[in-house]
Structure formats: structure tokens, C-alpha cells
């Protein structure tokens, strides 16, 4: 049955699924930093706590990390911690008097001459990107203050100065952000501040980095190098925020552990209507590659101050799920909003409704057809296991995986049931929180041999599924595990009847 035919069978009175596949990332800020507030977010549906390093000191973020871990421990769950880097940026200098009133139609000059760094006026002001004149051409636009002020470049006055026309009136203040849409900027992937922040993240044992403004695969390596050998197990999720990142997405996906569709800056760097297309491109490519993908920015923004979302916001969240996003992310809604728990609960309900309208079997077949033949052995086993779910109408899958790789491969093929990953590594439990459909169970197997531990882990996975109401006596459960007694590739699939 096609998705269109499936849509014709839907009813608003149908019950929703008994599990939510899409994961929710919450940005932690003044509204939600306390242990009690964090417990509220977790109970409402948060899987990942995001720290935005564009704001706050290391001491502030240290408190957040400690509180997240305390809240998770008190609730007996594993919550991932993500460090979102500030990234490289371009900014204006300072203005005489603190601001400048820019009038539509006026001529102004922007310069990279440091002599104007603190002497800006409406007629001439500083921008701190030294290669500005090399990458910007007449006819290009310069966006300032999140694109609220737009300048059109007319000519190169000299090697440091551009003549521009002001296209709209706006008052700008000191140190406003600058975007150069359509221009190939050559900023480094890791700023001096980022290097210090990344080392802080390594010391604190964060689970993943949301690396800002990644434009090439080489820059993923720069982030990995900055993390150093102690940070080798930290996931790198690349934020795609301009046209270069979209153009180079295939190689970026290959080098990274996942992708974030960072629609805020992306919607300034490319036309807003193109963001819709970019979102579909990035999510689909991640789906085919089996890499987690996050949809972020302004998803339920009105709930920062209002108790209910707009209908358009509800559709936006649902559309991200329909597109195939593993995670949806909240920013100011939970960092500074008045209704942090309510917004997470709303998002969870929207994701669940959208998931219930999907025909996962269509997705499974589409993904399978797009894979190269011959498949790798592990991919073949995992895709066959998902096929077994559909053929037996199994209610859950149990995957034994220390690294989480097998669980991610299974999730790539979108079974229409929850995936329970049993692992002996706590970090794997947390890092799987950005993979759709996967719930993790930590199993301490130190006192057990491998084969004895294997059966105990399978039993632990089945018991977890029963405790969540995913399976009951008489249901089928598909299990994937390794058998180290067999030579060569030894991942095995078996089908259990739940007792």
C-alpha cells in the first residue's frame, strides 16, 4: 500500500501508537536549569539536554551538567548531554553612541579597517571579516542583525571598503551578526573560543557536539582534532547553516555522526522558501545513510510566551516527522519560556500523531531499494530482521549492541515497533537518544561470561519491553545478537515468543 492509499484509511478517531519514535531535544536555560525543572522536562519527554555555548560561562554550564545528571539519576533514566558550539561568526564593530539609524536608500560604506572598529556611524562602519572584499561582489547582499537590515553591495571602494545601498530602514547596535548569503566564506570551523569550550566538554564527558556552521567534510575533521584523543567517543553532529553545507552534504554526512538542519541561520543564508527543500534533502540523505538527523529552530516558538502552539507550528513539527527526522529540537521555548513542560508535552503528542499517520512499510521498502548491492553483512542481517518484524507482526525488537551500531542500522530500516537496545556501555545508552525508535537498557555484565551474559541481556530487553507495554504474552519479539562461537561474521536473528 502506498502512503497515499494509506492516508485514505486514516481517521482522527484512530488510537495512536503505543510508543513515540521521534526524540525531543531541549535547550536548557534560566527557565529549566534547576533539578526539579529538568525532572519535569524528562517526564514530559526530553531525551537530550542541549547547552548553547553562545551564551553562559563554563561555571553556568557546569551547573547545568551536574543538574541534568542528578535529575536523570533520581528518575532512573539516561539523558544525553549535547554541547552546541558558538562557531565562527562575522560581526559589526561598535558604533559611536552605541547604535546607528540606517535609512532606506542611503549610501553607506562597510570596511575591514580596524581603525573603524569602535568608530562606526550610519555612513561607515566596521565588519570583522578580513576577507570581506575578496568574497563579496557588486550585486551581493550583506545581511545584518539576523537579516533585519539588508545592504546591497554597489562597488569596491578600495581593498578594505565596500560601497553599499541600504535597502530598508533599521537601527543597528554594537556587535550585530553579519551573514553573506551566496558567498563562499572561508572562516575556520573551530574558533579560539570553540577550542576552549570543546576541551571543557571533553573534561565533563558530554555525549555529543552540535558543531556550528560546518561547510565541508574537512571541517568535521577539524572538530574531531580539537576534541583530541580523550574525546574520540564523543559524537559530532554537524549543523548545516548555509549553501556550502547543503552543497557538500554527502561528504559531510560520511564524515559526521549526524546532521542538524539548523533552519535559523540557514533561512538567512538562503531564501526562506528554499529551507523547505533543503530540509527534505538533508533529512532524506541522512535516512539513506542511516545517520541521525535533527530538525531545529522555531518549531513551537509561540509557546515561549503562549500556552498553546499555532496550527502552523503543529504542522511544522508533524512535517519534520513525515520527512523522516529522528529528532525535533526546542530552543528558546524551553531555555527561557513560560511553559517548558507544556511545550515538550505538546511536541511529544504531535510527534506521536504524525507517526501514527505514517506507513513505515513503505519507508522500509524505499530505503531497501536505495541500498547498494551487495550489502555489507551487518546491513543485510539488520534489514532482514526488520523484514521479519513485518512478516511476523512482531511487537518489539531487542538488539544487543555495545557500540549502538546495530541498533542504528535497525532503526535505519524503520520497523513499525520499538527497538530496545541492551548495552553494557552507559554512553551508548545516552548517545542512542538521538536515533528514532530506539530505547536503551544498560546491563552491567562484569560478573557474567559473554554467552551467559547474552541470554541475560536478551531477557532484560524483553522484560523492559513488557514493562513499557510494548509486548505481552503471546507476542513475537525479533532479537539480534552476536554469537562468538561461530567463525566469521556472526550476527544472528531469532524470533522469540514472549512468555
Curated annotation (Swiss-Prot):
It is an enzyme of class 2 (transferase). Activated by fructose 2,6-bisphosphate, activated by the effector in a non cooperative manner. K(+) binds at residues 52, 54, 84-85. Homotetramer. ATP binds at residues 52-55, 91. Keywords: ATP-binding, Glycolysis, Kinase, Magnesium, Metal-binding, Nucleotide-binding, Potassium, Pyruvate, Transferase. GO terms for molecular function: ATP binding; kinase activity; magnesium ion binding; potassium ion binding; pyruvate kinase activity. Substrate binds at residues 50, 264-265, 297. Signal peptide: none annotated. This is Pyruvate kinase. Belongs to the pyruvate kinase family. Pathway: Carbohydrate degradation; glycolysis; pyruvate from D-glyceraldehyde 3-phosphate: step 5/5. It comes from Leishmania mexicana. Disulfide bonds: none annotated.
Amino acid at each position: 500500500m502506498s502512503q497515499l492509499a494509506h492516508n485514505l484509511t486514516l481517521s482522527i478517531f484512530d488510537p495512536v501508537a503505543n510508543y513515540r519514535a521521534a526524540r525531543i531535544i531541549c535547550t536548557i536555560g534560566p527557565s529549566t536549569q534547576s533539578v526539579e525543572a529538568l525532572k519535569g522536562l524528562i517526564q514530559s519527554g526530553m531525551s537530550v539536554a542541549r547547552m548553547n555555548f553562545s551564551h553562559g560561562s563554563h561555571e553556568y554550564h557546569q551547573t547545568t551538567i551536574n543538574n541534568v545528571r542528578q535529575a536523570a539519576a533520581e528518575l532512573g533514566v539516561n539523558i544525553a548531554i549535547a554541547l552546541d558550539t558558538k562557531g565562527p561568526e562575522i560581526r559589526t564593530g561598535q558604533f559611536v553612541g552605541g547604535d546607528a539609524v540606517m535609512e532606506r536608500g542611503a549610501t553607506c560604506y562597510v570596511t575591514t579597517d580596524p581603525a573603524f572598529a569602535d568608530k562606526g556611524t550610519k555612513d561607515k562602519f566596521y565588519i570583522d571579516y578580513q576577507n570581506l572584499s575578496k568574497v563579496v561582489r557588486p550585486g551581493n547582499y550583506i545581511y545584518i542583525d539576523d537579516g533585519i537590515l539588508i545592504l546591497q553591495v554597489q562597488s569596491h571602494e578600495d581593498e578594505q571598503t565596500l560601497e553599499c545601498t541600504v535597502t530598508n530602514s533599521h537601527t543597528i547596535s554594537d556587535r550585530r551578526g553579519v551573514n553573506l548569503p551566496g558567498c563562499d566564506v572561508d572562516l575556520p570551523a573551530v574558533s579560539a573560543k570553540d577550542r576552549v569550550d570543546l576541551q571543557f566538554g571533553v573534561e565533563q564527558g558530554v555525549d555529543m557536539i552540535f558543531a556550528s556552521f560546518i561547510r565541508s567534510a574537512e571541517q568535521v575533521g577539524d572538530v574531531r582534532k580539537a576534541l583530541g584523543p580523550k574525546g574520540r567517543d564523543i559524537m559530532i553532529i554537524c549543523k548545516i547553516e548555509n549553501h556550502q553545507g547543503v552543497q557538500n552534504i554527502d561528504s559531510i554526512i560520511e564524515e559526521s555522526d549526524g546532521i542538524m538542519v539548523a533552519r535559523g541561520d540557514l533561512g538567512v543564508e538562503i531564501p526562506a522558501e528554499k529551507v523547505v527543500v533543503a530540509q527534505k534533502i538533508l533529512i532524506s540523505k541522512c535516512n539513506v545513510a542511516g545517520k541521525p538527523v535533527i530538525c531545529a529552530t522555531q518549531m513551537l516558538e509561540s509557546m515561549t510566551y503562549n500556552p498553546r502552539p499555532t496550527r502552523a507550528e503543529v504542522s511544522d513539527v508533524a512535517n519534520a516527522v513525515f520527512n523522516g527526522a529522528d529528532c525535533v529540537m526546542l530552543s528558546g521555548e524551553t531555555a527561557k519560556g513560560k511553559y517548558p513542560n507544556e511545550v515538550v508535552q505538546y511536541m511529544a503528542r504531535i510527534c506521536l500523531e504524525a507517526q501514527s499517520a505514517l506507513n513505515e512499510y513503505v519507508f522500509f521498502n524505499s530505503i531497501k531499494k536505495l541500498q547498494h548491492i551487495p550489502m555489507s553483512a551487518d546491513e543485510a542481517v539488520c534489514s532482514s530482521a526488520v523484514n521479519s518484524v513485518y512478516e511476523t507482526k512482531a511487537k518489539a525488537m531487542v538488539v544487543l549492541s555495545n557500540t549502538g551500531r546495530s541498533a542504528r542500522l535497525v532503526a535505519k530500516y524503520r520497523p513499525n515497533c520499538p527497538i530496545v537496545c541492551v548495552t553494557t556501555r552507559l554512553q551508548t545508552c545516552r548517545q542512542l537518544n538521538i536515533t528514532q525508535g530506539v530505547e536503551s537498557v544498560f546491563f552491567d555484565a562484569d560478573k557474567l561470561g559473554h554467552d551467559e551474559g547474552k541470554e541475560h541481556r536478551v531477557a532484560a530487553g524483553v522484560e523492559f519491553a513488557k514493562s513499557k507495554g510494548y509486548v505481552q504474552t503471546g507476542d513475537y519479539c525479533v532479537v539480534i545478537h552476536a554469537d562468538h562461537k561461530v567463525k566469521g561474521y556472526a550476527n544472528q536473528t531469532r524470533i522469540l515468543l514472549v512468555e
